[in-house]
């Protein structure tokens, strides 16, 4: 039996401009390889809807597993969720469990659970949530695509929760 293959898609204009340094590709590559998952490709792409959709389609067809990093936060340029949904022909829904986790988190921190933060509870239909013990904003898995936040500490958390299920 051959080892599964994987690809990483890092999404964000801030990475391409050099304003933010990517720390997720190298770390995730080490984790995947330690599990016998062969990382075959990594791409850094801009926050452009068509580019995200086409890259996800191409890479999910070519590899057993795809991991995305970035674009699922509360800001206007965080469009990864809607693009992943579009790539698989799914609708984006307000996920009740994700919303409850986020509401509880923001109530406990005393911060307002405003519309921008509520956006982080929007998940493609049929996606499975990935828990986030750091900030409560979940990642998700749709088909063979694992969608992670770009914040390195959250990526580490998501990875520790998802890699054991791939053995």
Predicted regions and their residues:
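Conserved anion/nucleotide-ligand pocket segment
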Residues: 136-158
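Single conserved hydrophobic/aromatic residue that forms the stacking wall/gate
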Residues: 160-167
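Glycine/small-residue-rich loop that forms an oxyanion/phosphate-binding "nest" at active or ligand-binding sites
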Residues: 81-115
């Amino acid at each position: 039996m051959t080892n599964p293959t994987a690809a990483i898609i890092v999404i964000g204009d801030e990475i391409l401009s050099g304003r933010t340094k990517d720390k997720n590709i190298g770390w995730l590559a080490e984790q995947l390889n330690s599990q016998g998952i062969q990382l075959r490709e990594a791409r850094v792409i801009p926050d452009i809807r068509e580019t995200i959709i086409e890259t996800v389609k191409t890479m999910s067809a070519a590899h057993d597993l795809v991991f995305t990093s970035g674009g699922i936060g509360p800001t206007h340029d965080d469009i990864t969720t809607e693009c992943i949904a579009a790539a698989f022909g799914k609708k984006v829904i307000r996920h009740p469990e994700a919303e409850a986790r986020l509401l509880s988190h923001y109530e406990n921190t005393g911060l307002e659970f405003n519309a921008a933060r509520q956006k982080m509870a929007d998940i493609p239909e049929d996606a499975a949530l990935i828990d986030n013990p750091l900030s409560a904003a979940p990642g998700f898995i749709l088909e063979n695509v694992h969608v992670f936040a770009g914040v390195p500490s959250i990526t580490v958390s998501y990875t520790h929760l998802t890699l054991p299920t791939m053995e």
